[in-house]
């Protein structure tokens, strides 16, 4: 967990403690957020490209959308 930022570690602790809801379809959750980031014209092109690249890699390597 040390390699992740403070906000991620905080949310992790909240989910683990039951204070924040757990999402069983974690890959779907990640892809939804990455898609939202990649499509958001208010964000920098660099951030959008990073999100698109991460989502595409996830789709190629791990995820099957049925």
Swiss-Prot record:
Domain of life: Bacteria
Transmembrane segments: none
InterPro entries (alphabetical): UPF0253
Family: Belongs to the UPF0253 family.
HAMAP family, per database record: UPF0253 (MF_01064)
Protein name per the record: UPF0253 protein CKO_03176
């Amino acid at each position: 967990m040390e390699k992740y930022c403070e906000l991620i570690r905080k949310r992790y602790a909240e989910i683990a403690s039951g204070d924040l809801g757990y999402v069983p379809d974690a890959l779907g959750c990640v892809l939804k957020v990455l898609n939202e980031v990649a499509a958001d014209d208010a964000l920098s092109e660099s951030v959008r490209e990073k999100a698109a690249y991460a989502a595409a890699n996830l789709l190629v390597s791990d995820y099957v959308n049925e």
